[in-house]
Amino acid sequence: ILHLKNTGRKDYFYEEAIKTLRTNIQFCGSGLKTIMFTSSMPDEGKSETAFALASSFGNIGKKVLLVDADIRKSVMVKRYEIKGNPNGLSQYLSGQKSLEEICYETDMENLDMVLSGPFSPNPAELLEDELFKTMIESVKEIYDYIIIDTPPMANVIDGAIIASQCDGAVIVIESGAISYRLVQKVRSQLEKSGCRILGAVLNRVGGGYEHSYYEKYYGRRGGKYYGKYGRHYGRYEEGKAPPVNEVSGARIKNDTTAQSQDT
């Protein structure tokens, strides 16, 4: 069993936004089981939002598997202070571990997790393997929802590969930080994969948000996040995210308790 830390409740508005997102996803239809969360660039809040939604589904009695599919640069183990050396997705996809060996129960209600595993130099090739498809088909028989946290899609192809195995996708957009054109690029990639776009979460709405910590950690956004994969894009594009009525979703309040140090 994985013992997770830093999972306490956020502020009231954050919790209500996550409940709204959960309800909207339920309204999308009973056939929706595998849902991916992605973003254009690192640090838009997708990993925290995916975790919060998975936890929220668990709280209402749904059995949920949260899959950390960001094999390049995961944040889950560090953020939730997971101890030991747990197996992960990269080991399963490379044939080192079985599916049973990478699925972990957690100390949270109805929530199991698959962690990313050790860094792999060729994650796109691993994700394209038949083993990933087999895994998704197998866990669909067990869980009510499979929530997949994917890498940001502006720089690498991993997210589009994962999307081809998902029933729906949610794009997380940091308010005021990502251009409309860049979000449309992600949207186009998802459409080409055949994945249904459920909508978007407009994250960190209202107030200013300090980027200096993240620029120091990641370089200038994508440039250092993926090494050679990110240099093509360099610094993230200036501009504002699309209005919420252009890509429907939950507004998550910008508050110190709701901000995520996230990819």
Model-found features: residue ranges?
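P-loop NTP-binding module
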Residues: 3-263
